[in-house]
């Protein structure tokens, strides 16, 4: 296998790896959007509780308002932790994607350089062959 073929194979592998990383990034972005949406709903529920103090919730009539507000606060903290973790994960994925782009670019540069080197060698060989044939022919 020639050096160019090995570089093409490496480039193809890096491109496939980047595709997988892009899918992973898309999943992380969707997960983060979902968590943010849940947090928004939670904040809206908290505001609703704050706007009607003293009432009991029909679905949670056994709970006092303060207990429910405390539960919402606890869930909010947990959601915030998940959002922070998912944001960190997304940042790592973006860093990996950037590294993969640099590696792919580097491999492509090496492949182009090797291809050019092979073309120059082929041209030199053809010129030498032409010179050799010209020297053989009588004038």
Positions of PLM-derived features:
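Charge-rich amphipathic alpha-helical interaction elements
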Residues: 1-139
């Amino acid at each position: 296998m020639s050096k160019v073929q090995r570089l093409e194979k490496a480039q193809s592998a890096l491109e496939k790896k980047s595709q997988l990383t892009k899918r992973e990034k898309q999943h992380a972005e969707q997960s983060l959007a979902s968590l943010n949406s849940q947090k928004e709903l939670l904040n809206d529920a908290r505001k609703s509780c704050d706007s009607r103090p003293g009432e009991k919730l029909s679905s949670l009539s056994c709970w006092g308002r303060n207990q429910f507000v405390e539960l919402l606060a606890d869930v909010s903290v947990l959601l915030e932790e998940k959002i922070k973790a998912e944001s960190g994960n997304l940042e790592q994925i973006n860093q990996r994607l950037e590294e993969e782009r640099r590696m792919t670019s580097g491999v492509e540069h090496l492949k182009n350089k090797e291809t050019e080197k092979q073309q120059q060698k082929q041209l030199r060989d053809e010129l030498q062959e032409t010179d050799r044939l010209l020297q053989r022919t009588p004038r």
